[in-house]
A protein has these predicted regions:
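A short beta-strand micro-motif common to beta-rich folds, especially ectodomain repeats
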Residues: 79-89
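Aromatic-lined carbohydrate-recognition surfaces of secreted/lumenal glycan-active proteins
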Residues: 215-226
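An acidic-aromatic substrate-binding cleft motif
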Residues: 94-191, 207, 211-216
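Conserved, mostly hydrophobic/aromatic
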Residues: 3, 85, 148, 218
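Surface-exposed binding patches on compact interaction domains or structured appendages
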Residues: 2-68
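Short, surface-exposed loop/turn segments at beta-strand-coil junctions that are enriched for proline
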Residues: 71-78
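Structured alpha-helical segments in the cores of large, soluble enzyme domains
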Residues: 198-208, 226
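Surface-exposed loop/turn motifs at beta-strand-loop junctions within extracellular Ig-like
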Residues: 72, 89-91
C-alpha cells in the first residue's frame, strides 16, 4: 500500500485489523513501512522494512510505502481472509479505509528450509551501529540471526560457537541448513581462525551428529583471485 500527499501531512497513523475468514479463523499479520535512503549518484531508494511507527509524516508530492506481512499456520483453514486497512490523521479522523484480502491455499511448506544458503552478517557492524557492549552485541546478533531465519535466509555464523551447548539448538534446527565451523570474517565467536586443538574438538562433536555434519562448512579464503 502506498500513501501520497499534495501537502505536508504529519501525525498520520495506519493500522490493519485481523485477517479473518467467514468462520472467524484468524491469520497472523503485521504492518511494515518502507525506509528510504539517499544513494550517492543514484537518488532515493526504499531499503529496509521496519515496523510501522506511530505519528509518521509524508512530505508534499512524496509517497510512503507500506507492506503487510501475513503468516498462515501449518494447519490453517484454506480460503479467503479479509482485513480492514485504516489511515487516520493527526486528529484521529479516518482518512481512508480499504479492505485487504489474503488467500490461503490447501498446502503447507515444509519446516525445513529448502533453499540452501550461507549469507554473511557482520557482528562488528551490528556492534558499531548500535553502539553496544559485547554481551548486548551477542543478544542483538541473535535477534538478527533469528529474523533472517524466520524469513528462510540462513546466516553462516551461528550466534554461539559450535563448541558450546548453546549452539546445539541452532545446529539441530531444521530451518538451519548451513553453519560456519571455521573461517569467515566475523571473529572467533562466529567462526574465525581455529587452532588444531579446536578443530579436533569441533570434528569430534559435529561428526558424531550426522545432521550437523551435513550442515557444517569451512570458508577459509574470501573471494580468491587465483
Amino acid at each position: 500500500a502506498y500513501l501520497a500527499a499534495k501537502a505536508d501531512r504529519e501525525g498520520l497513523n495506519i493500522s490493519i485489523s485481523a485477517f479473518a475468514d467467514a468462520d472467524g479463523n484468524i491469520l497472523e499479520s503485521e504492518m511494515l513501512r518502507e525506509e528510504y535512503y539517499t544513494v550517492i549518484d543514484y537518488g532515493v531508494v526504499p531499503e529496509s522494512l521496519p515496523p510501522v511507527a506511530k505519528n509518521f509524516k509524508i512530505s508534499a508530492d512524496r509517497q510512503q510505502g507500506f507492506f503487510i506481512r501475513v503468516t498462515s499456520a501449518e494447519n490453517q483453514k484454506p480460503g479467503l481472509y479479509r482485513a480492514l486497512l485504516s489511515v487516520t490523521d493527526a486528529d484521529g479522523k479516518t482518512v481512508k479505509n480499504a479492505y485487504v484480502y489474503a488467500k490461503v491455499w490447501d498446502f503447507s511448506l515444509p519446516v525445513e528450509t529448502s533453499c540452501k544458503t550461507a549469507f554473511g552478517m557482520s557482528a562488528y557492524t551490528i556492534y558499531t551501529t548500535h553502539g553496544v557492549t559485547s554481551d548486548e552485541n551477542r543478544e542483538l546478533y541473535t535477534k538478527y540471526y533469528e529474523y533472517f531465519l524466520k524469513n528462510r535466509i540462513n546466516i553462516w555464523g551461528l550466534p554461539f560457537d559450535p563448541l558450546t551447548d548453546e549452539a546445539d539448538a541452532f545446529m539441530s534446527d531444521p530451518r538451519v541448513n548451513t553453519f560456519l565451523v571455521a573461517g569467515g570474517y566475523n571473529g572467533h565467536m562466529y567462526g574465525g581462525n581455529r587452532n588444531s586443538s579446536e578443530l579436533k574438538e569441533l570434528y569430534e562433536k559435529i561428526s558424531a551428529n550426522e545432521d550437523w555434519a551435513k550442515k557444517a562448512i569451512f570458508y577459509m579464503n574470501d573471494e580468491p583471485m587465483d
